[in-house]
Design a protein with these regions (language model features):
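Gly/Ser/Thr/Pro-rich low-complexity, intrinsically disordered segments
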Residues: 1-432
Length: 432
């Protein structure tokens, strides 16, 4: 049985905050949801850039070419991005090509409606490939009683740090019934639900896993060196073969080091090449978990609200200074307000899900609409409703809860007419 209630909190300056609290009885019913291919994912992503991201910080962005493929997989998408980066320039907003291959690709994409150009103030071009395997939660798994967005995913130019990163790639640990769907990254906290009923916030690492490539299994850090962000932008030069892994795919093998470290994955250096690019990767080591999801920061641990950043984030104002993990964050734990999603457990170990409604990015009415919550404010709310262990999931414009197909609150991204503009996401959670 799923139970929902709406709560309201008064804030200084006559602001208010609305929160949806959802409870149900068992973790076994919680599953990951993959929205699948969304026909409008490219267009909707470009609209988010045009309406919200670039107007908020136009001095950060140059010209952005977002594109998808009408057909083909991840390898083909990355190859197309490399072709466009090498052979395409924009002059006066018009494309110029250095070779016939690039021109042919551009014409194919243009005819299929798979190109979107958005403009910031800086004089450079960034090519951003967009995965087609993203979609709208509202159009996915319509029979599910509960749907909510989940972990972070690659979304902006800083996230697309290497040729291996594509917009719409989910990242961070995801475990379902002992199976690792994606590995842990970036030293961020995760919510672990053990088969024996324990629920805890922990910080998993790649060294906790075994990595299987083909028929061989390796322990990162013992059988081979592991390189990930924010520790490394490139692997050091040296002997061996760098195996570039994103999710459950071996995307490249580079000999001798100097390999870019993806924001959405990691590099495992082995003495010999194992497997071929495009091959499958599997993980072991989490068989004792019923469920696990990594995003961070924690909100409540041991019944006490978290008082500052524990998970590793990077300040959006200076992303170029060091190798940075994805999901750049405004590092003000106390004051930076936004829409938030929390997942955790009460004292009996039963699930709690909260959505703090964000301020509308267009047409916000102070005192009438929600103002959004800082992580500090949200942690206090989570503790007050009885959460004893819990983490923050992806928030902002992605934040929403659908219960029996309906939203009790509103998404913070809005169109000019005030209607909600839902973001396409690659991963969610559901209870059927």
């Amino acid at each position: 049985m799923i139970r929902s209630e709406l709560l309201s909190y008064e804030r200084p300056g006559r602001e208010r905050q609305r929160v949806q609290l959802v409870r149900w009885d068992d973790w076994a019913s919680l599953r990951f949801l993959r929205p699948g291919v969304g026909a409008d994912a490219l267009r909707e992503t470009a609209q988010i850039y045009r309406r919200f991201l670039i107007p908020a910080a136009p001095w950060v962005f140059g010209q952005l070419l977002l594109f998808a493929l009408p057909e083909g997989g991840e390898a083909e998408l990355r190859a197309a991005a490399e072709t466009l980066r090498r052979g395409l320039r924009l002059r006066g907003g018009e494309p110029r090509f250095s070779d016939k291959k690039t021109r042919a690709l551009w014409e194919t994409l243009s005819r299929a409606g798979c190109v979107e150009l958005v403009r910031g103030r800086l004089p450079f071009l960034r090519v951003l490939p967009v995965r087609s395997s993203t979609g709208l939660l509202s159009e996915s798994e319509p029979d599910a009683r509960l749907r909510v967005n989940a972990s972070f995913f690659i979304f902006d130019p800083f996230d697309c740090a290497t040729r291996y990163d594509t917009v719409g790639t989910p990242f961070g640990l995801a475990v379902e019934d002992g199976e690792v769907l994606s590995p842990p990254l970036c030293g961020r906290e995760a919510l672990f639900v053990y088969r024996d009923g324990r629920v805890r916030v922990e910080t998993p690492t790649l060294e906790d896993l075994t990595v299987r490539i083909g028929d061989k299994a390796f322990r990162p850090g013992r059988d081979g060196a592991v390189y990930a962000r924010p520790g490394y932008r490139k692997t050091p030069r040296g002997r061996g073969f760098d195996h570039v892994i994103v999710g459950r795919t071996l995307v490249d093998v580079v000999r001798g080091g100097g390999c870019p470290v993806p924001a959405s994955g990691f590099v495992l250096r082995l003495a010999e090449q194992t497997g071929e690019p495009g091959g499958a990767v599997a993980y072991g080591g989490m068989e004792g978990l019923l469920f696990g999801v990594q995003a961070g920061n924690s909100l409540v641990r041991g019944g006490a609200p978290t008082e500052g950043f524990v998970s590793r984030f990077w300040n959006v104002r200076e992303p170029w200074r060091t190798p940075f993990p994805p999901s750049l964050y405004p590092l003000d734990y106390e004051k930076a307000r936004a829409a938030r999603i929390a997942l955790g457990a009460d004292a009996a170990g039963k699930p709690l899900l909260l959505w703090a409604e964000g301020a509308a990015k267009i047409g916000h009415r102070p005192g009438e609409d929600s103002c959004g919550a800082s992580l500090s404010e949200f942690a206090a709310i989570c503790r007050d409703v009885g959460m004893v262990e819990g983490v923050n999931l992806d928030g902002g414009g992605s934040a929403q809860i659908l219960l029996d197909g309906k939203r009790a609150l509103q998404i913070s991204d809005r169109r000019d007419d005030g209607s909600e503009q839902e973001r396409a996401v690659p991963l969610g959670l559901m209870v059927k």
